[in-house]
């Protein structure tokens, strides 16, 4: 039976199989954890916290996908695949998907609607992703 990853691979589909790369995995993890730490910096505006935390989440989720040996052609799929990459449920990936939508509305339509509640939820989701990614053994070089 094909995996959820295999079902999303192929021409016109959002994933492609690609062997994991230890340096890439470690770099994505380091970048994600640094951005997550920076998102909690004192004196940051909500929009800066959101931007840092969203990009931290994306880097960490992408690291998990790369660990499984796949590359994504779009940002959203790394959040949708969290049940398969890190065994995280909808309470996490739905927050990240909402943040992706908020980010896109801001980037492409100039309508950035960030609330303190959204940033708190995003940081909590990032913490769960970070804990799971940090528990992964880096792929062999």
PLM-predicted stretches and their roles:
Residues 1-141:
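Terminal alpha-helical segments
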């Amino acid at each position: 039976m094909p995996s959820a990853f295999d079902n999303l691979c192929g021409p016109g589909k959002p994933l492609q199989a690609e062997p994991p790369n230890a340096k890439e995995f470690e770099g994505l993890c380091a970048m994600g954890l640094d951005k997550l730490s920076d998102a909690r910096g004192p004196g940051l505006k909500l929009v800066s916290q959101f931007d840092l935390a969203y990009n931290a989440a994306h880097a960490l989720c992408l690291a998990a996908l790369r660990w499984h040996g796949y590359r994504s052609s779009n940002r959203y799929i790394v959040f949708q695949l969290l049940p398969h990459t890190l065994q995280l449920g909808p309470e996490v990936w739905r927050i990240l998907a909402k943040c992706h939508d908020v980010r896109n509305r801001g980037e492409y339509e100039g309508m950035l609607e960030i609330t303190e509640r959204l940033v708190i939820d995003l940081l909590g989701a990032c913490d769960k992703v970070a804990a799971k990614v940090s528990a992964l053994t880096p792929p062999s070089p």
